[in-house]
Amino acid sequence: MFSLIRAKRLAIGIAALAWSTGAVMASEHWPDLPVGIKNGAAARIGNMAYVGLGSAGTDFYALDLNNPSKGWVKRANFIGPATNGAAMAAAGGKIFAFSGNGKATPDAKSPIIFDTAYVYDPGSDGWSKLDTQTPVGLSGAKAVGLADGRIAIFGGYNKELFDKYLADVGAIDKDKEPEAYRNLVDSYMGMKPEAYRWNDEVLVYDPAGNNWGSLGANPFLPNCDPAMATMGEGDFLLVSGEIKPGLRTPEAKLVKIRDGAAHWQKVSDLPPLSGSEPQEGVAGAYAGKAGDDVLVAGGANFKGAQANAAAGKWFAHDGLAKSWRDDVYAFDGKDWKVAGKLPRGLAYGAAFDAPGGLLVVGGEDRDGKARKEVFLLKWDGKALSVEN
């Protein structure tokens, strides 16, 4: 995202910014987020966009998409511990936040994956803790509202393994015990993807009954922090994401939810960037519909991790530098193509369908900085441009 001091104008005329509905709004100056937000969560109800958590701590903000000149308005703080990577979705006029990771108390020695769930009511501007526990860890998962009022959730880290690993790491002084520290990290990071036991069920939460169910198993390796786009009612495209810490997949899958079950179909992989640079896959990318196509932009990976994994080196990102990607891809329902570039490498922000393109909000840059800026990736099916 551009670091701009001047106000930014998205010259898109009168159009609809569609996350889940098609609200109409006029072209306006779009305000920056009040603070940079990465690893946060976002949802929309009607014309109101909600973004927060992650690097914003317990802060939660709303923007009226029909009147963006009012700017982002501070809403009630999240009442749980500061949370990264929560799964968030809207249903029945409320916003639900599941799991995530962080310290249970400020003085806790290590983070954990939360098994809690919270609901935000815009009418009362208040949060409540739900009387339920997530069946598994859902940090890094994707949540989406369904037409029947339930919420489907894909992926998520294993709470037991994650909590134990971070507790063990936190108990070792790596300066005084470098060998023990290295052995612990090597042991955890060197496991094959299946050993991490990430959530391989399509879970479903029913707010009306406050209960959980399953739409069936994921026939592929479960992944975390994929990009996700809504293709139609009950149809979702899951793109790339991690299959274990440090290793992404270039795979994309179409999920159709019909008759109480999730039906999976593999579609084309993200394409290689060049003959000399294979596709590593990305985590934390931005995605959404742009006309008839899906755009996937940015994300982060480790160049060389795929080759290491193919050679049986399962600590695949050991010694590799993390890369924040600026690549943008377009998918026409059959094939991918490289559409262009972001202004900078970005990952772990929010993205929303917008008229003619993809609205990119917040995220993390190559310096690890949480960004505040918003811009539109405009796509006409042939050429990509940036409006800011």
Swiss-Prot record:
Classification via PANTHER family: KELCH-LIKE PROTEIN 32, LD33804P
Subcellular location: Periplasm
EC number: 5.1.3.24
GO MF terms held by the record: racemase and epimerase activity, acting on carbohydrates and derivatives
Top-level taxon of origin: Bacteria
Gene name linked to the record: nanM
Catalytic activity, as annotated: N-acetyl-alpha-neuraminate = N-acetyl-beta-neuraminate
Catalytic site positions: E242
Enzyme class: isomerase
Kelch repeats: 48-92, 94-147, 149-186, 187-232, 236-285, 307-356, 358-387
TM segment ranges: none
Signal peptide span: 1-26
Subunit details: Homodimer.
UniProt protein name: N-acetylneuraminate epimerase
HAMAP family with a match to the protein in the record: NanM
Pfam families, per database record: NANM
Keyword Signal tagged: yes
Family as reported in the entry's similarity comment: Belongs to the NanM family.
Keyword Signal: yes
Gene Ontology CC: one annotated term: periplasmic space
The protein's role, per its UniProt record: Converts alpha-N-acetylneuranimic acid (Neu5Ac) to the beta-anomer, accelerating the equilibrium between the alpha- and beta-anomers. Probably facilitates sialidase-negative bacteria to compete successfully for limited amounts of extracellular Neu5Ac, which is likely taken up in the beta-anomer. In addition, the rapid removal of sialic acid from solution might be advantageous to the bacterium to damp down host responses.
Keywords: Carbohydrate metabolism, Isomerase, Kelch repeat, Periplasm, Repeat, Signal
Gene3D superfamilies: Kelch-type beta propeller
